[in-house]
Amino acid sequence: MKKKKLLVMAGGTGGHVFPAIAVAQTLQKQEWDICWLGTKDRMEAQLVPKYDIPIRFIQISGLRGKGIKALFNAPFAIFRAVLQAKKIIQEEKPDAVLGMGGYVSGPAGVAAKLCGVPIILHEQNAIAGLTNKLLGKIASCVLQAFPTAFSNAEVVGNPVREDLFEMPNPDIRFSDREEKLRVLVVGGSQGARVLNHTLPKVVAQIADKLEVRHQVGKGAVEEVRQLYGENLEQVKITEFIDNMAEAYAWADVVICRSGALTVCEIAAVGAAAIFVPFQHKDRQQYLNAKYLSDVGAAKIIEQADLTPEILVNSLKNFTRENLLQMALKAKTMSMPNAAQRVAEVIKQYSN
């Protein structure tokens, strides 16, 4: 019997790519073939082959900040990308197409519609991106991570790594903690300059009360070391953290951006958080953070309001019991079967 095949269209950032990989792996375990459609110059080109998933490319890029010439050429570029995607779809003959966001999704989604292939969309953020808003009109099914992106789409959560759900529950992790407050600082894989510059000033004021792990992002270790100065004893600085599940579980509180994947990872582990949303025009990260802050599982500090003093006061006001309650509330908001549910919908529409 011929194997079923899924074409994944996702790219650009980890927030699109990692949830798509989780779904792809779920279907691979069920004997599906997977093919990926991306762009050569974004992270999926290097990342996806590491998971033994073949990847093919179309030429498309974003238009933001590209100037008038790029805008003028945009219709031609999109038309070319649709034709490229259509050719690949005709060659690969997928039973379904999964759109997880990124520049590639738009033209590939149109091509899938032209080829008569069912399109399943997944919106990772609390507010839908332009591509998914448009594709939502032609998709066979739209799924969402948070209940606010689409008014009539099923809420399934964000597919995250299984190891996050395997960590001990917050009440077990917190049971023997009596020492300094454990603070994990994460600025995404690129780090976040505002956190790199603010946290050393926070530690300088309350170094005796904190133990800090700080992921600073690529190339920032030396600069941040110098900023921490004499307080380095309290801080472990790394470019990247390989085992994020363990790092989240170690922490009493996480200070970080509020990308969709980060918010769902924190819920999966069950951790208290202080979110400093990136300042998008559409308030995307702020709305993601509200998913946990609205139930008392997280605190939001807007970047414009972020000062060392505000962060110091926030940390001083936390007790371990208070942070444990936040962590337990975060855990109740997790959706452990997101990848499986997306896979089920794909199977349903592929028949």
Curated annotation (Swiss-Prot):
Signal peptide range: none
Pathway: Cell wall biogenesis; peptidoglycan biosynthesis
Keywords assigned: Cell cycle, Cell division, Cell inner membrane, Cell membrane, Cell shape, Cell wall biogenesis/degradation, Glycosyltransferase, Membrane, Peptidoglycan synthesis, Transferase
Subcellular compartments: Cell inner membrane
SUPFAM superfamilies tied to this protein: UDP-Glycosyltransferase/glycogen phosphorylase
Membrane association type: Peripheral membrane protein
Pfam family, one: Glyco_transf_28
EC number from the UniProt entry: 2.4.1.227
NCBIfam families tied to this protein: murG
Function, as annotated: Cell wall formation. Catalyzes the transfer of a GlcNAc subunit on undecaprenyl-pyrophosphoryl-MurNAc-pentapeptide (lipid intermediate I) to form undecaprenyl-pyrophosphoryl-MurNAc-(pentapeptide)GlcNAc (lipid intermediate II).
HAMAP family tied to this protein: MurG (MF_00033)
Protein name according to UniProt: UDP-N-acetylglucosamine--N-acetylmuramyl-(pentapeptide) pyrophosphoryl-undecaprenol N-acetylglucosamine transferase
Protein source organism: Haemophilus influenzae (strain PittEE)
